């Protein structure tokens, strides 16, 4: 009975550790509590769960383009906000300003998507500013 109980406990711990390993912490990648704005031309969404990504081209001071990638919400959230089809749909080339939580290193062209502001001034929020 003791061997069986020990086996069950060890299996449970193994399963739990795999689950915990699979989930990630935002604090290890993004500078939580900080905010940045990036303006550029929309390129595309990659709609996959659990986190979609959005890419924009940003022009540097020297005129060269840098592709930025932002992690956003789920496919359902993107659809619900009408970003793929609907009132807030983005088309390649649309000029937008993206509010993000920047990368922890402060240099990488990546961020956690907080909001998109369109050329006409309206904003779509993914998360509240204090999250």
Explain the meaning of each model-derived region.
Residues 7-19:
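Bacterial N-terminal signal peptides
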Residues 21-36:
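Short boundary/loop segments of OB/S1/cold-shock single-stranded nucleic-acid-binding domains
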Residues 48-59:
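Short aromatic-glycine-enriched beta-strand elements
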Residues 61-74:
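A short macromolecule-binding patch
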Residues 73-81:
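Short, structured beta-strand/loop micro-motifs enriched in basic residues and often containing a Trp
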Residues 80-98:
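Short nucleic-acid-contacting surface segments enriched for D/E, G, S/T with interspersed K/R
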Residues 101-128:
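OB-fold/S1-family single-stranded nucleic acid-binding modules
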